[in-house]
Swiss-Prot record:
Protein name: Histidinol-phosphate aminotransferase
Enzyme class: transferase
InterPro entries: Aminotrans_II_pyridoxalP_BS (IPR001917), Aminotransferase_I/II_large (IPR004839), HisP_aminotrans (IPR005861), PyrdxlP-dep_Trfase (IPR015424), PyrdxlP-dep_Trfase_major (IPR015421), PyrdxlP-dep_Trfase_small (IPR015422)
Catalytic reaction equation(s): L-histidinol phosphate + 2-oxoglutarate = 3-(imidazol-4-yl)-2-oxopropyl phosphate + L-glutamate
Gene3D superfamilies: Aspartate Aminotransferase, domain 1, Type I PLP-dependent aspartate aminotransferase-like (Major domain)
NCBIfam families: hisC (TIGR01141)
One of the GO BP terms on file: L-histidine biosynthetic process
Key words, A-Z: Amino-acid biosynthesis, Aminotransferase, Histidine biosynthesis, Pyridoxal phosphate, Transferase
Length: 346
């Protein structure tokens, strides 16, 4: 049957998510998930009816949390669907292109390739910042520029002045898509305030990380109302199941927000603990991280990754030579991981 698939799909290499890669163990620090398993009321009614395309209570709650108007907010099945919607809505197949800056999140490329949209890359600089001159030289045919901050997998923040320069550079030419999946761990670095000034800005958000709802698959796109209305033309008629909308709305309640804030503080403290501990091991380079993960360069990254895997500590290998990404888990998980790495290099 594969021969019946589109040629581009036949050639496609699927994104290898943490779950696809698999593994067995009791310490899972490979998918940037939260260690907190929060409880929600699940006495759902109305499951015999379709959900609203954009549930009003959920949209209102997230808009209030993000500091935007409900008309500037769209919810979808994770931020991944937001990526796909933007490409489908704004890029002509075999005509337009997207641009992204590796090393970064892999789904920008996969979504574009699946739809038949050209992918242009301008690698990040040595300190993992935007190469603005390189981007400007490659903007021909580009409709969307994806920027992840905090960047996955490197963990760093993209300089605000560079984001503004990029928005100015792409005015009336392309949309800058800021992937803020991890911004809840450093909300002061958000670009949401720039929406009022730049109509060519779209922001991706998720409840998977700081809100501990990776299994719920609930994301958001923030943008000006005109852009949101374009996305509403291509989104599925019932993208958010009733249970998803109700649990997400609970997570965004006053009590839910207070809990998320406390858990973010806890995870940021665990990140600092892990960063200091790893930095004290000779031969390791620990990069500053602003999300719920750290990128670490080892003398022999692939060997360390494999040894940890075989010991039941599941980390995430990286396209960056000898680098491994470590999610920030519970204090117990961080202690076990740190202890294993110390012993490995002792």
């Amino acid at each position: 049957m594969e021969k019946l698939a589109r040629k581009s799909v036949q050639k496609l290499t699927p994104y290898l998510s943490a779950r696809r890669i698999g593994g067995t163990g009791d310490v899972w620090l490979n998918a940037n998930e939260s260690p907190f398993d929060n409880e929600y009321r699940t006495n759902f009614a109305r499951l015999n009816r379709y959900s609203d395309c954009q549930p009003k209570a959920l949209i209102a709650a997230y808009a209030a949390y993000a500091g935007v108007k409900p008309e500037q907010t769209l919810t979808s099945r994770g931020a991944d669907e937001g990526i796909e919607l933007l490409i489908r809505a704004f890029c002509e197949t075999n005509e337009d292109a997207i641009l992204y800056c590796p090393p970064t999140y892999g789904m920008y490329s996969v979504s574009a390739e699946t739809i038949g949209v050209e992918r242009k890359t301008v690698p990040l600089t040595e300190d993992w910042q935007l190469d603005l001159s390189g981007i400007e030289a490659n903007l021909d045919k580009v409709k969307l520029v994806f920027v992840c901050s905090p960047n996955n997998p490197t963990g760093n923040l993209v300089k605000r002045e560079d984001i503004i320069a990029l928005l100015e550079m792409t005015k009336d030419r392309a949309i800058v898509v800021m992937d803020e999946a991890y911004i809840d761990f450093c909300p002061e670095a958000s670009t949401v305030d720039l929406l009022a000034q730049y109509s060519n800005l779209a922001i991706l958000r998720t409840l998977s990380k700081a809100f501990a709802l990776a299994g719920l698959r609930c994301g958001f796109t923030l943008a000006n109302e005109e852009l949101i209305n374009v996305l509403l033309k291509v989104i599925a008629p019932y993208p958010v199941p009733v249970p998803v909308a109700e649990i997400a709305t609970q997570a965004l309640s006053e009590a839910g927000l207070a809990r998320a804030k406390f858990q973010v503080l806890d995870l940021n403290a665990n990140r600092a603990y892990l960063q200091v501990g790893l930095s004290m091991i000779a031969g390791l380079e620990v990069f500053e991280g602003w999300g719920n993960y750290l990128l670490v360069k080892f003398p022999n990254g692939d060997e360390l990754f494999k040894a940890a895997w075989e010991s039941g500590i599941i980390l995430r290998n990286s396209p960056i030579k000898d680098c491994v990404r470590i999610s920030v888990g519970s204090r117990d998980e961080c202690e076990k991981t740190l202890g294993f790495i110390r012993n490995y290099y002792s």
